[in-house]
Amino acid sequence: MKSFMASPATIERKWYVVDATGHTLGRLSSEIAKVLRGKNKAIYTPHIDTGDYVIVVNADKIKVTGKKMDQKIYFSHSDYPGGVRETTLKEMLAKKPEDVITLAVKGMLPKGPLGRSMLNKLHVYAGPEHNNAAQKPEVLEIKY
């Protein structure tokens, strides 16, 4: 008997919505990355994007442990000499809370074209409202 290999024609994608209120950043991001990769499905195939769509609401109400709010630093570079910019987690949550979850999940996905296609299925919103109601998302319970 041959092993089952998923193909793009055999994949059925669902939409899930996750409320980030009170959840720890890393634990929540890990669960989201599993769903985006499709590791929670029986048809998981490593070289095919078998994952589902995930909508995250209330990204500005995420929590972190310890002193990460002041000590965690995000780096970006403008490609010019001396163009390094540093932003703390506290500043990032004030300006762009969506990017905090997006960057955490991005680091947990494969690098390359497959990982980028998986990341495109993630939709993060700072507030409680999202504009994906037409997709009829199911609530994804995070159990910790």
Swiss-Prot record:
GO terms for molecular function: mRNA binding; structural constituent of ribosome. One of its GO terms (cellular component) is cytosolic large ribosomal subunit. Keywords: Ribonucleoprotein, Ribosomal protein. Disulfide bonds: none annotated. One of its GO terms (biological process) is translation. It comes from the Bacteria. The keyword Ribonucleoprotein applies. InterPro entries: Ribosomal_uL13, Ribosomal_uL13_bac-type, Ribosomal_uL13_CS, Ribosomal_uL13_sf. Belongs to the universal ribosomal protein uL13 family. This protein is one of the early assembly proteins of the 50S ribosomal subunit, although it is not seen to bind rRNA by itself. It is important during the early stages of 50S assembly. Part of the 50S ribosomal subunit. This is Large ribosomal subunit protein uL13. It comes from Lachnoclostridium phytofermentans (strain ATCC 700394 / DSM 18823 / ISDg). The gene is rplM.
